[in-house]
Amino acid sequence: MKKFLLLLLLVISPVRAEIYDINQLDLKSHQGKVIYLDFWASWCKPCQKSFPWMNSLLAKYPADKFTIITINLDAETEAMHYFLGKVKADFDIYHDPSGQIAEQFELEGMPTSYLIDSNGKVVKKHIGFYTKKVDQYEREIEELL
């Protein structure tokens, strides 16, 4: 029954993104682009609010200069898929159930996002997501484009 429900969820899910294993993540392959790197989990309410905004960024900025990479930290794949069944994602998602990448980035809260310039340098870090700050977030992106 559990497998049936998961399969059903995958079929009706609004997910547009590809989901990858964290071991497939290669930030260097995006060199030359500004990267918005976002860590999230299914239980995180602010994470749900950030997804529509991140989707809008992909439509706003040129794909050859900007990309979004998100990393899900749910231990259980089912929790991630359940979340993605409710919230549309137009960007690629990497699943890091052990938190190995999160540990390297020394996360302090959820969600946490990093703005990485086209040379691969982390230039901004945001803990949490606040809709009242989206203009600021976008200015920071535009300064790097």
Identify the meaning behind each predicted range:
Residues 4-13:
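Sec-dependent N-terminal signal peptides
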Residues 17-35:
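A short beta-strand-turn-helix
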Residues 33, 51-71, 85:
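Conserved helix-turn-beta segment immediately C-terminal to the redox Cys motif
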Residues 33-35, 39-43, 109:
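Short pre-active-site segment immediately N-terminal to redox-active cysteine/selenocysteine motifs
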Residues 39-56:
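Conserved redox-active cysteine motifs that mediate thiol-disulfide chemistry
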Residues 65-78, 90-98:
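Thiol-based oxidoreductase modules, predominantly thioredoxin-like and allied folds used
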Residues 84-118:
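Short, internal strand/loop/helix patches
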Residues 118-145:
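Thiol-/selenol-based redox modules, centered on thioredoxin-like
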